[in-house]
Swiss-Prot record:
Subunit: Homotrimer.
Annotated CDD domains: GT2_GlmU_N_bac (cd02540), LbH_GlmU_C (cd03353)
Binding locations of acetyl-CoA: A380, N386, Y387, S405, A423, R440
Gene3D superfamilies cross-referenced by the UniProt entry: Hexapeptide repeat proteins, Spore Coat Polysaccharide Biosynthesis Protein SpsA, Chain A
Organism: Bordetella petrii (strain ATCC BAA-461 / DSM 12804 / CCUG 43448)
Gene name of the encoded protein: glmU
Binding note for cofactor: Binds 1 Mg(2+) ion per subunit.
Residue ranges of the region described as Linker: 230-250
Swiss-Prot/TrEMBL GO biological process terms: cell morphogenesis; cell wall organization; lipid A biosynthetic process; peptidoglycan biosynthetic process; regulation of cell shape; UDP-N-acetylglucosamine biosynthetic process
Location in or out of the cell: Cytoplasm
Stated name of the protein: Bifunctional protein GlmU
């Protein structure tokens, strides 16, 4: 049975914020959520989050998440004391029970690294370590002449010889659950900080004859913690650099990898091109040959092969077919579904609407709550008037219709197949198929009329 304990009780004073530190965002989601997602991939029997400062807000953010429990650390008296608060919630079934300790402000540790750590422990304990050129402030890994881990000494408690050690403790640890409970009951706060150190369980394990293994992360950024806005920004950049590297290695062309942000997951086909300043949020899928112009924002979208999305377009919770042309300055809102070879041009907004294959809305239009068939032309300035002040109503435009410029369609209303609406029409009743419908006032010329002149 695998238990995961995530320490998330810290104040985060240097963040200069009322928001609990672990709820601050990294790559589009709270730091704690990154840790929860990585832990969940290990399929633990239970995850316990130890909360303290801002406990109610942290609980409120994740209370409904399956398999999650909370323990309160009050007051905060060190990492060992924090894990002690989780002890009553740890589960054991007698089958290789193990507890993994993670940190809510170390958000980017990867599941593969955690799997290696669990393997490294064998039947004993294991710590995740790292080699640093400058180890100032970190706990040092002290090994014996045979290279076996003996203990961890915190920087403030270390001798000069121990401070010369480059291998440091990341704080992440795995240990047999039953033995961990025993070791936690035996640690004390006889140290420079006056706190109960989780690291002391390593020395207790060695004293009890329990082997302590070690593993290293695949990349140094995995174990970087966040204690300030500066560190948050630095880690954000490191993570975005990693995202860019992965996309480049997968064959995506990035106009500038330094100006590229993924705040979720981005899946790309072959020969995708992404220009500068683009942001991808949630789950985004780009098929083969998609081109995304500069400064676009895509959130929870699927884009078909060969589609071009031009500059400054925003696409959210929408689907776009093959070989479509979107933008520049287009906005697709939730529920927009565009078919193959559709065109949505500058300053066109589409919400909760279907635009079937080969239909076009190239200029200055609002299409909301509409079902538009194939090969429809929507003229500039067209508006579907979908809201009556209380309820939304749908507009239906059948195949091959032509909607003239500056037209208002007052829903609920239907435009029949092949119908034409004259420019300036305000449509309040259904337009019959194959006919021209016009509702604007008749043009009049007043002969002899003179424009008023200013009085001198």
């Amino acid at each position: 049975m695998l238990n995961v304990v995530i320490l998330a009780a810290g104040l985060g004073k240097r963040m200069q914020s009322d928001l609990p530190k672990v709820l601050h965002s990294l790559a589009g989601k709270p730091m704690l959520e990154h840790v929860l997602d990585s832990a969940s991939q290990l399929e633990p029997g239970r995850i316990v989050v130890v909360v303290g400062h801002g406990a109610d807000r942290v609980r409120g953010a994740y209370e409904g998440r399956a398999g999650l429990s909370f323990a309160l650390q009050q007051p905060q008296q060190g990492t060992g004391h924090a894990v002690q608060q989780a002890v009553p919630l740890l589960q054991e079934d007698g089958k290789d029970d193990v507890t993994l300790v993670l940190y809510g402000d170390v958000p980017l540790v990867q599941p593969d690294t955690l799997r290696r750590l669990l393997q490294a422990r064998g039947q004993g304990a294991a710590v995740l370590t790292e080699l640093l050129d400058d180890a100032t402030g970190y706990g040092r890994i002290v090994r014996n002449e045979q290279g076996q881990v003996q203990r961890i000494v915190e920087h403030k408690d270390a001798s000069e010889a121990e401070r010369a050690i480059r291998e440091v403790n990341t704080g992440i640890l795995a240990a047999p659950t039953g033995r961990l409970k025993d070791w936690l009951s035996r640690i004390d706060n006889n140290n420079a900080q006056g706190e109960y150190y989780l690291t002391d369980v390593v020395g207790l394990a060695v004293a009890d004859g329990v082997p302590v293994g070690a593993a290293q992360p695949s990349a140094g950024w995995e174990t970087l913690g966040v204690n300030s806005r500066v560190q948050q920004a630095e880690l954000e950049r490191r993570w975005q650099q990693e995202q860019a590297r992965r996309q480049l290695e997968a064959g995506v062309t990035l106009a500038d990898p330094a100006r590229f942000d993924v705040r979720g997951t981005l899946t790309c086909g072959r020969d995708v091109f992404i220009d500068v300043g683009c942001v991808f949020e949630g789950k985004v899928e780009l098929a083969d040959g998609v081109r995304v112009g500069p400064h676009c924002v895509l959130r929870d979208v699927s884009v078909g092969a060969g589609t071009h999305i031009d500059a400054y377009s925003h696409v959210q919770q929408a689907t776009v077919g093959r070989d479509a042309r979107i933008g520049p300055y287009a906005r697709l809102r939730p529920g927009a579904s565009l078919g193959d070879r559709t065109h949505v041009g500058n300053f066109v907004e589409i919400k909760n609407s279907v635009l079937d294959a080969d239909s076009k809305a190239n200029h200055l239009a609002y299409i909301g709550d509409a079902d538009i068939g194939a090969r429809v032309n929507v003229g500039a300035g067209t508006i579907t008037c979908n809201y009556d002040g209380a309820n939304k109503h749908r507009t239906i435009i059948e195949d091959d219709a032509f909607i003239g410029s500056d037209t208002q369609l007052v829903a609920p209303v239907r435009v029949g197949r092949g119908a034409t609406l004259g420019a300036g029409t305000t449509l309040t009743r259904d337009a019959p198929a194959g006919q021209l419908t016009v509702s604007r006032a008749r043009q009049t010329t007043i002969e002899g009329w003179q424009r008023p002149q200013k009085k001198s």
